[in-house]
């Protein structure tokens, strides 16, 4: 329950987004959070003009009818791995550098299996490059209408 096997938490995302759609607000605590000592909840106040659900699983097939727009950020695997390991090491999120590398290799193996089965980019309305492309200023991004 957001501590389940990678990308097998679609039922939680469906439950949260369904509640948000029907009631206009959300205060959701994934069932596993208290068991793992995680406090708080995922809260969206009534009247929020939009909600961003972030992550590689945010556009999964199971929620396609519950989201209005899907944006796919296309990034080279090596660049994503390097950024993730650097960020997690700097923040201490997944331990030291060695533990972060181990986590990221585990994560990327699960992510690749999810991508092969679900192909979320095929439902994307907009594709954004996750890498700086030649000729763009620092405040510019490259994008195209989806799907890929």
What are these regions (language model features)?
Residues 65, 69, 86-90, 112-148:
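NTP-dependent small-molecule kinase module
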Residues 23-28, 40-41, 45-46, 94-102, ...:
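Catalytic cores of transferase enzymes with a strong primary signal for eukaryotic protein kinases
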Residues 1-53:
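Conserved nucleotide-sensing/catalytic segment adjacent to the nucleotide-binding pocket
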Residues 26, 31, 61, 112-113:
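Flexible, active-site-adjacent loop/turn segments at secondary-structure boundaries
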Residues 3, 69-115:
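A glycine- and Lys/Arg-enriched "phosphate-lid" helix/loop adjacent to the NTP-binding pocket
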Residues 5-13, 104, 117, 121:
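A structural signal for well-ordered alpha-helical scaffolds and beta->alpha junctions
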Residues 37-88:
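ATP-dependent NMP and nucleoside kinases share a basic, alpha-helical "lid"
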